[in-house]
Amino acid sequence: LRMNFFKHIFLGFIFTAITLTVNNYVFAQETDVSSRQIDEIIVTSRKTEENIQDVPIAVYAVDEKALDDFRPTTMRDLDSLAPNLQVGMNTASGNQGAIFVRGCGYAEVEKTQNPPVGLIVDGLFLGTNTGTLLDAFDWSKIQVNSGPQGVVYGKNTSCGNVVVERNKPSKDFEVDTEVSIGNYEAYELGLILNIPINDKVSSRWNFRKLAHQGYYDNLFTEQDSGQLDIAAASARFLIEATENTEIYIVTDYYYDRGDTAPVSYSGNPFGAGCVPNFGAGLGLVGAADNGCTPGLGAVTATELSTAGAAIGITPFAAFAGLEPFFSQTEALPPHVVNLDNPEQSDMDFIRGSIEIVSDTLIGEVTIATSYLQLDDNVLQDFDATPGIAGGQGNPATLGGPLHTARNQHFSQFSQEIRVSNDITDKLNLTTGIFLWKDSIMLQQHSGGVVQTSGQDTESVAIFALVKYDVTDD
């Protein structure tokens, strides 16, 4: 027994040694490969091109090869791609992102606030989270900078930002296509044309189309719901004006004709045939044995009717005998909805920008001018029930419809002038001025009431960034 014991101990040591040796070898190989990949990643977290290992802030970058392997379809697919990055969709609009970094972000629909996680595409900061779920086509790099970033990158980006860079035009002729199909009548079409115009001017043209019929079954319309219908076109020009000056022009057009995220009814929490006690202020108390969910103070539809009839409130009096109208207590199955109002999310998005970079006697001068215009029209059924026509109502709205319609117009203009200069071999100074102007107009249609509001914003920022290398390495 003792010999067998020592034999097992000896074999265990040998097995452990072999395992550690193999693991160390594999780890060393992976480390070498990882190091080579990291060395090749250049980021612009401080407005200058630097190796990611030399940047003293929390930054995560994904290069073109990794993007090709990952194959994201839209910005939504980047959810959790980087540590502490969440990319969700706002349910009140089909193309409205809810981007969070380290748990900090903005998930509301209003454009009166700039999102604290900025999205920057080819140098253009998007001043709203509408339209941020862009198609992920011809991307060359994604960079996630943890916040705060408002001083150097973006407006009010206290939580951080996501920087997207697309491939710039090159001097080589290139044609690239992409076609894919799937279930639910899903398809993706993509076309890339890189056309050199002459020795100094190159152009790159993109077209992208994404669509599917929707993953939800609508019981009321007997049709599919939640469809996707997005198209995007881009033309980019790179001009080598002189040996020291480069001009980059970007134009984009996006449109979205899909559906908003369908709202599914989760059942009547007050109990079958019961509604909230909207007559509590009138002294209404439901019977103890009325069958409603205890602790919620709910009453039956007839009890609410009795209270209304007693004091002559006609809307309450009309609920007599309507218990079957509020009888559904179970949630609908997954991917099943029962909506009587169209789900619509229309968006038109145009942008144009020009960036001039020139090496001068005072350093590298960058002049960036951009304009963006966005129009969207969103219809949504928030009560998630078909109402009288479908024989089922939402007790929270007393069976009435809660349908919203939002027409919004947003435009922004920005101008940035930046100078980066190496004062010495170790000291770099970047200074600049950023001008911003945006305009918002909103019309809200709910319950037959039209509300119109607007806001204009102008702001100016002056910034400076000093970088000093303490050591030679």
Describe these PLM feature segments.
Residues 24, 171, 199-200, 211, ...:
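Short coil turns and loop connectors of transmembrane beta-barrels in diderm outer membranes
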Residues 36, 92, 132, 155, ...:
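Transmembrane beta-barrel outer-membrane domains
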Residues 36-172:
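Acidic, small-polar-rich N-terminal luminal/periplasmic segments of exported/outer-membrane proteins
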Residues 222, 228-429, 438:
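Outer-membrane beta-barrel domain signature, strongest for Gram-negative TonB-dependent receptors
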